[in-house]
Amino acid sequence: MKRTYQPNKRKRSKVHGFRARMSTKNGRKVLARRRRKGRKVLSA
């Protein structure tokens, strides 16, 4: 059985990246939440 995590920089950015987050209303909510919490890294 293959492992579920097959690293791929492009997919990681497309799915979890900053611009992906900014492109939707809920994604912006995620960033706002993480800023409020004081996360050093906001997105992938």
UniProtKB/Swiss-Prot annotation:
Q: Which GO terms describe its molecular function?
A: structural constituent of ribosome
Pfam families noted in UniProt: Ribosomal_L34 (PF00468)
**Which residue windows does the record flag with biased composition (Basic residues)?**
1-19, 26-44
Q: Does this entry carry the keyword Methyltransferase?
A: no
Check the record and name the InterPro entries matching this protein.
Ribosomal_bL34, Ribosomal_bL34_CS
Which keywords describe this protein according to UniProt?
A: Ribonucleoprotein, Ribosomal protein
Which GO terms fall under biological process for this protein?
A: translation
Q: Answer yes or no on keyword Cytoplasm.
A: no
Query: Could you tell me which residues belong to the region Disordered?
Result: 1-44
Q: Can you quote a single GO CC term?
A: ribosome
What is stated as this protein's family in its record?
Belongs to the bacterial ribosomal protein bL34 family.
Q: What is this protein called?
A: Large ribosomal subunit protein bL34
